[in-house]
Amino acid sequence: MGGLSIWHWLIVLLIVALVFGTKKLRNIGNDLGSAVKGFKDGMKDGDAPADAQQLPRSGTVDVNAKEATRSDSNKA
């Protein structure tokens, strides 16, 4: 009694088709499909390696150098 049978879903689908029209529903389906395709393409592009300019430089960073500069300015 709590679940909807196939007949309930068919009636709902028929009402939606009458209200919006099949052409409008087809356009909505096409728009939704192209949006999903664009999202998947964007996710593929996000996995591609970045350009050499955008990659972080590999090397060591001297964290103590900044703190040493601060200590010198506080003494003066």
Curated annotation (Swiss-Prot):
<comment type="similarity">
    <text>Belongs to the TatA/E family.</text>
</comment>
<keyword id="KW-1003">Cell membrane</keyword>
<comment type="function">
    <text>Part of the twin-arginine translocation (Tat) system that transports large folded proteins containing a characteristic twin-arginine motif in their signal peptide across membranes. TatA could form the protein-conducting channel of the Tat system.</text>
</comment>
<protein>
    <recommendedName>
        <fullName>Sec-independent protein translocase protein TatA</fullName>
    </recommendedName>
</protein>
<dbReference type="InterPro" id="IPR006312">
    <property type="entry name" value="TatA/E"/>
</dbReference>
<feature type="transmembrane region" description="Helical">
    <location>
        <begin position="1"/>
        <end position="21"/>
    </location>
</feature>
<keyword id="KW-0813">Transport</keyword>
<dbReference type="GO" id="GO:0033281">
    <property type="term" value="C:TAT protein transport complex"/>
</dbReference>
<comment type="subunit">
    <text>The Tat system comprises two distinct complexes: a TatABC complex, containing multiple copies of TatA, TatB and TatC subunits, and a separate TatA complex, containing only TatA subunits. Substrates initially bind to the TatABC complex, which probably triggers association of the separate TatA complex to form the active translocon.</text>
</comment>
<dbReference type="GO" id="GO:0008320">
    <property type="term" value="F:protein transmembrane transporter activity"/>
</dbReference>
<feature type="region of interest" description="Disordered">
    <location>
        <begin position="43"/>
        <end position="76"/>
    </location>
</feature>
<dbReference type="InterPro" id="IPR003369">
    <property type="entry name" value="TatA/B/E"/>
</dbReference>
<keyword id="KW-0997">Cell inner membrane</keyword>
<keyword id="KW-0811">Translocation</keyword>
<keyword id="KW-0472">Membrane</keyword>
<keyword id="KW-1133">Transmembrane helix</keyword>
<dbReference type="GO" id="GO:0043953">
    <property type="term" value="P:protein transport by the Tat complex"/>
</dbReference>
<keyword id="KW-0653">Protein transport</keyword>
<dbReference type="Pfam" id="PF02416">
    <property type="entry name" value="TatA_B_E"/>
</dbReference>
<keyword id="KW-0812">Transmembrane</keyword>
<feature type="compositionally biased region" description="Basic and acidic residues">
    <location>
        <begin position="64"/>
        <end position="76"/>
    </location>
</feature>
